Design a protein with these regions (language model features):
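Hydrophobic transmembrane alpha-helices and their helix-loop junctions in integral membrane proteins
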Residues: 3-4, 8-189
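Cytoplasmic/organellar membrane-interface segments at the starts of transmembrane helices
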Residues: 128-131, 183-256
Length: 256
Protein backbone atom coordinates (compact mmCIF):
# COMPACT_ATOMS: atom_id res chain seq x y z
CA UNK A 1 0.00 0.00 0.00
CA UNK A 2 3.00 2.30 0.53
CA UNK A 3 3.74 2.46 -3.22
CA UNK A 4 0.16 3.44 -4.02
CA UNK A 5 0.14 6.21 -1.37
CA UNK A 6 3.48 7.52 -2.59
CA UNK A 7 2.28 7.67 -6.19
CA UNK A 8 -1.10 9.14 -5.28
CA UNK A 9 0.07 11.88 -2.92
CA UNK A 10 3.67 12.17 -1.82
CA UNK A 11 5.50 12.30 -5.12
CA UNK A 12 3.36 15.29 -6.15
CA UNK A 13 4.78 17.41 -3.30
CA UNK A 14 7.80 18.42 -5.38
CA UNK A 15 5.88 19.56 -8.45
CA UNK A 16 3.24 21.24 -6.27
CA UNK A 17 6.07 23.09 -4.54
CA UNK A 18 7.39 24.27 -7.90
CA UNK A 19 4.04 25.85 -8.72
CA UNK A 20 3.04 27.05 -5.26
CA UNK A 21 6.37 28.30 -3.95
CA UNK A 22 9.25 28.38 -6.46
CA UNK A 23 7.47 30.22 -9.26
CA UNK A 24 5.24 32.45 -7.14
CA UNK A 25 7.79 33.40 -4.45
CA UNK A 26 10.80 33.59 -6.76
CA UNK A 27 9.47 34.55 -10.21
CA UNK A 28 12.69 36.22 -11.40
CA UNK A 29 14.84 33.24 -10.43
CA UNK A 30 12.31 30.89 -12.01
CA UNK A 31 12.45 32.86 -15.25
CA UNK A 32 16.27 32.81 -15.22
CA UNK A 33 16.54 29.06 -14.69
CA UNK A 34 13.60 28.05 -16.91
CA UNK A 35 15.76 26.98 -19.91
CA UNK A 36 17.93 24.81 -17.64
CA UNK A 37 14.92 23.20 -15.97
CA UNK A 38 13.27 22.53 -19.33
CA UNK A 39 16.48 20.81 -20.45
CA UNK A 40 16.56 18.68 -17.29
CA UNK A 41 12.88 17.81 -17.78
CA UNK A 42 13.56 16.54 -21.30
CA UNK A 43 16.49 14.49 -19.98
CA UNK A 44 14.19 13.04 -17.32
CA UNK A 45 11.63 12.04 -19.96
CA UNK A 46 14.17 10.20 -22.08
CA UNK A 47 16.25 8.76 -19.22
CA UNK A 48 13.20 7.41 -17.37
CA UNK A 49 11.86 5.86 -20.55
CA UNK A 50 15.11 4.07 -21.44
CA UNK A 51 15.53 2.81 -17.89
CA UNK A 52 11.94 1.52 -17.90
CA UNK A 53 12.55 -0.35 -21.16
CA UNK A 54 15.48 -2.19 -19.58
CA UNK A 55 13.66 -3.26 -16.42
CA UNK A 56 13.04 -6.93 -15.66
CA UNK A 57 11.18 -6.21 -12.41
CA UNK A 58 7.58 -5.04 -12.68
CA UNK A 59 7.74 -2.56 -9.78
CA UNK A 60 11.01 -1.15 -11.10
CA UNK A 61 9.35 -0.72 -14.49
CA UNK A 62 6.46 1.27 -13.02
CA UNK A 63 8.82 3.37 -10.90
CA UNK A 64 10.93 4.42 -13.88
CA UNK A 65 7.84 5.27 -15.93
CA UNK A 66 7.06 7.79 -13.20
CA UNK A 67 10.44 9.47 -13.72
CA UNK A 68 9.54 9.94 -17.37
CA UNK A 69 6.05 11.19 -16.51
CA UNK A 70 7.39 13.73 -14.02
CA UNK A 71 9.67 15.01 -16.75
CA UNK A 72 6.52 15.87 -18.71
CA UNK A 73 4.97 17.51 -15.65
CA UNK A 74 8.05 19.65 -14.98
CA UNK A 75 8.30 20.61 -18.65
CA UNK A 76 4.67 21.74 -18.62
CA UNK A 77 5.17 23.80 -15.47
CA UNK A 78 8.25 25.66 -16.72
CA UNK A 79 6.95 26.15 -20.25
CA UNK A 80 5.17 29.09 -18.59
CA UNK A 81 2.09 28.91 -20.78
CA UNK A 82 -1.49 28.43 -19.67
CA UNK A 83 -1.78 25.24 -21.72
CA UNK A 84 1.45 23.79 -20.38
CA UNK A 85 0.63 24.72 -16.78
CA UNK A 86 -2.91 23.34 -17.02
CA UNK A 87 -1.58 20.18 -18.64
CA UNK A 88 0.99 19.74 -15.87
CA UNK A 89 -1.64 20.17 -13.15
CA UNK A 90 -3.98 17.74 -14.89
CA UNK A 91 -1.08 15.34 -15.43
CA UNK A 92 -0.51 15.20 -11.67
CA UNK A 93 -4.14 14.19 -11.16
CA UNK A 94 -4.09 11.61 -13.95
CA UNK A 95 -0.75 10.17 -12.89
CA UNK A 96 -2.14 9.61 -9.42
CA UNK A 97 -4.82 7.34 -10.86
CA UNK A 98 -3.06 5.50 -13.70
CA UNK A 99 0.21 4.71 -11.93
CA UNK A 100 -1.46 3.93 -8.61
CA UNK A 101 -3.68 1.49 -10.52
CA UNK A 102 -0.60 -0.14 -12.03
CA UNK A 103 1.02 -0.51 -8.61
CA UNK A 104 -2.18 -1.94 -7.12
CA UNK A 105 -2.60 -4.55 -9.83
CA UNK A 106 1.11 -5.35 -9.87
CA UNK A 107 0.94 -5.88 -6.11
CA UNK A 108 -1.94 -8.33 -6.48
CA UNK A 109 -0.07 -10.14 -9.25
CA UNK A 110 3.09 -10.43 -7.15
CA UNK A 111 1.11 -11.60 -4.12
CA UNK A 112 -0.40 -14.43 -6.17
CA UNK A 113 2.76 -15.40 -8.06
CA UNK A 114 5.31 -14.78 -5.32
CA UNK A 115 7.58 -12.96 -7.77
CA UNK A 116 8.01 -9.50 -9.29
CA UNK A 117 10.06 -10.66 -12.29
CA UNK A 118 8.25 -9.90 -15.55
CA UNK A 119 9.39 -13.15 -17.18
CA UNK A 120 7.63 -15.16 -14.45
CA UNK A 121 4.29 -13.94 -15.75
CA UNK A 122 2.73 -14.95 -19.05
CA UNK A 123 -0.68 -15.75 -20.49
CA UNK A 124 -2.54 -14.06 -17.63
CA UNK A 125 -5.41 -13.05 -19.90
CA UNK A 126 -6.43 -16.72 -20.05
CA UNK A 127 -6.07 -17.39 -16.33
CA UNK A 128 -7.07 -14.07 -14.73
CA UNK A 129 -8.99 -12.07 -17.38
CA UNK A 130 -10.31 -9.33 -15.07
CA UNK A 131 -6.88 -8.64 -13.59
CA UNK A 132 -5.38 -8.71 -17.09
CA UNK A 133 -7.88 -6.19 -18.45
CA UNK A 134 -7.44 -3.78 -15.55
CA UNK A 135 -3.66 -3.96 -15.96
CA UNK A 136 -4.08 -3.34 -19.70
CA UNK A 137 -6.30 -0.27 -19.22
CA UNK A 138 -3.99 1.22 -16.58
CA UNK A 139 -0.99 0.56 -18.82
CA UNK A 140 -2.65 2.18 -21.83
CA UNK A 141 -3.44 5.23 -19.71
CA UNK A 142 0.22 5.42 -18.69
CA UNK A 143 1.02 5.24 -22.40
CA UNK A 144 -1.33 8.22 -22.94
CA UNK A 145 -3.63 6.35 -25.30
CA UNK A 146 -6.35 8.66 -26.70
CA UNK A 147 -9.59 8.15 -24.80
CA UNK A 148 -7.83 7.59 -21.49
CA UNK A 149 -6.92 10.18 -18.87
CA UNK A 150 -3.21 10.81 -19.49
CA UNK A 151 -3.66 11.63 -23.17
CA UNK A 152 -5.32 14.99 -22.52
CA UNK A 153 -2.70 16.17 -20.04
CA UNK A 154 0.26 15.00 -22.13
CA UNK A 155 -1.19 16.68 -25.22
CA UNK A 156 -1.64 19.98 -23.36
CA UNK A 157 1.91 19.82 -21.98
CA UNK A 158 3.44 19.24 -25.42
CA UNK A 159 1.31 21.89 -27.16
CA UNK A 160 1.98 24.44 -24.42
CA UNK A 161 5.71 23.72 -24.46
CA UNK A 162 5.95 23.85 -28.25
CA UNK A 163 4.76 27.46 -28.37
CA UNK A 164 7.75 28.61 -26.28
CA UNK A 165 10.34 25.81 -26.51
CA UNK A 166 9.63 23.93 -29.76
CA UNK A 167 12.88 21.92 -29.73
CA UNK A 168 12.20 20.64 -26.20
CA UNK A 169 8.65 19.67 -27.17
CA UNK A 170 9.82 17.82 -30.28
CA UNK A 171 12.46 15.90 -28.32
CA UNK A 172 9.87 15.25 -25.61
CA UNK A 173 7.63 13.51 -28.13
CA UNK A 174 10.31 10.83 -28.32
CA UNK A 175 9.14 9.90 -24.83
CA UNK A 176 5.78 8.92 -26.31
CA UNK A 177 7.45 6.54 -28.76
CA UNK A 178 9.59 5.06 -26.00
CA UNK A 179 6.49 4.73 -23.81
CA UNK A 180 5.02 2.39 -26.42
CA UNK A 181 8.06 0.16 -25.92
CA UNK A 182 8.15 0.16 -22.13
CA UNK A 183 4.40 -0.46 -21.84
CA UNK A 184 3.51 -2.68 -24.80
CA UNK A 185 6.44 -5.09 -24.45
CA UNK A 186 5.65 -5.93 -20.78
CA UNK A 187 1.93 -6.11 -21.61
CA UNK A 188 2.72 -8.66 -24.33
CA UNK A 189 4.95 -10.68 -22.00
CA UNK A 190 2.61 -10.59 -19.00
CA UNK A 191 -0.84 -10.90 -20.57
CA UNK A 192 -0.32 -12.75 -23.85
CA UNK A 193 1.59 -15.72 -25.18
CA UNK A 194 1.68 -19.18 -23.60
CA UNK A 195 0.83 -19.49 -19.93
CA UNK A 196 4.05 -19.59 -17.93
CA UNK A 197 4.40 -22.73 -15.76
CA UNK A 198 3.23 -21.87 -12.26
CA UNK A 199 0.54 -19.44 -13.44
CA UNK A 200 -2.13 -22.03 -14.28
CA UNK A 201 -3.80 -21.90 -10.87
CA UNK A 202 -3.57 -18.17 -10.17
CA UNK A 203 -6.86 -16.71 -8.93
CA UNK A 204 -8.55 -13.71 -10.52
CA UNK A 205 -9.48 -10.56 -8.61
CA UNK A 206 -11.88 -11.20 -5.75
CA UNK A 207 -14.87 -8.99 -4.94
CA UNK A 208 -12.92 -6.78 -2.53
CA UNK A 209 -10.18 -6.15 -5.10
CA UNK A 210 -12.72 -5.45 -7.85
CA UNK A 211 -14.45 -2.89 -5.63
CA UNK A 212 -11.08 -1.27 -4.89
CA UNK A 213 -9.90 -0.98 -8.50
CA UNK A 214 -13.23 -0.26 -10.26
CA UNK A 215 -13.49 3.45 -9.26
CA UNK A 216 -9.89 4.06 -10.32
CA UNK A 217 -10.45 2.52 -13.76
CA UNK A 218 -13.73 4.45 -14.09
CA UNK A 219 -11.98 7.76 -13.40
CA UNK A 220 -9.24 6.91 -15.92
CA UNK A 221 -11.86 6.37 -18.63
CA UNK A 222 -14.09 9.33 -17.71
CA UNK A 223 -11.16 11.75 -17.50
CA UNK A 224 -10.09 10.64 -20.94
CA UNK A 225 -13.42 11.46 -22.53
CA UNK A 226 -14.53 14.43 -20.42
CA UNK A 227 -11.76 16.28 -18.53
CA UNK A 228 -13.58 19.65 -18.68
CA UNK A 229 -14.84 19.74 -15.06
CA UNK A 230 -11.30 19.28 -13.74
CA UNK A 231 -9.81 21.70 -16.27
CA UNK A 232 -12.38 24.32 -15.27
CA UNK A 233 -10.98 24.13 -11.73
CA UNK A 234 -7.35 24.13 -12.86
CA UNK A 235 -7.33 26.79 -15.59
CA UNK A 236 -7.82 30.00 -13.54
CA UNK A 237 -4.94 29.15 -11.20
CA UNK A 238 -2.71 28.06 -14.08
CA UNK A 239 -3.30 31.31 -15.94
CA UNK A 240 -2.67 33.39 -12.83
CA UNK A 241 0.61 31.60 -12.06
CA UNK A 242 1.88 32.33 -15.58
CA UNK A 243 0.90 36.00 -15.24
CA UNK A 244 2.48 36.32 -11.79
CA UNK A 245 5.73 34.89 -13.14
CA UNK A 246 5.87 37.75 -15.64
CA UNK A 247 5.22 35.77 -18.80
CA UNK A 248 2.82 36.77 -21.54
CA UNK A 249 0.88 33.74 -22.70
CA UNK A 250 1.66 33.09 -26.40
CA UNK A 251 -1.30 30.74 -26.83
CA UNK A 252 -5.04 30.88 -26.42
CA UNK A 253 -6.28 30.01 -22.95
CA UNK A 254 -7.41 26.44 -22.39
CA UNK A 255 -11.14 26.00 -22.79
CA UNK A 256 -11.64 29.38 -24.44
Amino acid sequence: MGSEMCIRDRDKVGTYGMIRFCIQLFPDASKTFTPLIITLAVISIIYGAFMAIGQKDIKGLIAFTSISHFGFITMGIFAMTSQGMSGANLYMVNHGFSTAALFLIAGWMMMRRGSSTISDFGGLQRVTPVMAWTFFIAGMSSLALPGLSSFVSEFLVLVGTYTRYPVAAIIGTLGIILAALYILIPVQKILHGPTTPGNENLTDLNLREKIAIAPVILVIVLMGFYPKPVLDLINPTSEQVVINAGFSDPVAKVGK
